[in-house]
Amino acid sequence: MIVCCGEALIDMLPRQSQAGETAFAPYAGGAIFNTAIALGRLGIPTGFFTGLSDDMFGDILRETLKSSNVDFAPSATLSLHTTLAFVKLVNGSATYAFFDENTAGRMITTEHLPALGDFCEALHFGAISLIPEPCGSTYEAL
């Protein structure tokens, strides 16, 4: 099994409401999350480790992982918010506003590290989750 380790977040993509107002729709995302989803959909045994929130956005992330055949049992569930990334599109180019302070993904610590047995053949890390603390040190310890 390949265990992907890193951020899972909700991309809030711009839409237009029925009244013509600007609105946002939630979509599961994150660089490493998307890698895990792709591997799972290709039928490659895949696990995912991060901090997942027990909020409604965490439910979206877990359902997306489950429906893509990704084992999220290695992930920790925390009673903190999910990271949100609001997206602004201008001429096809995206800019982001991230809301990540004290979120489930960012606040995982070495106490949340999973026991990876012989089933784990490879770990895949990457993206922004390797930088902030305490999650950066947690991934390094894994």
Regions found by a protein language model. Give the residues of each.
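Generic recognition of cysteine residues
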Residues: 4-5, 120, 135
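Charged helix-capping and loop-helix junction motifs
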Residues: 136-142
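A conditional alpha-helix N-cap/helix-loop micro-motif detector
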Residues: 28-29, 106, 135-136
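Glycine-rich phosphate/adenosyl-contacting loop at the front of the ribokinase-like
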Residues: 1-70
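Conserved N-terminal subdomain of the carbohydrate kinase-like
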Residues: 45-128, 132
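Glycine/Thr-rich phosphate-binding loops of Rossmann-like dinucleotide-binding domains
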Residues: 12, 132-133
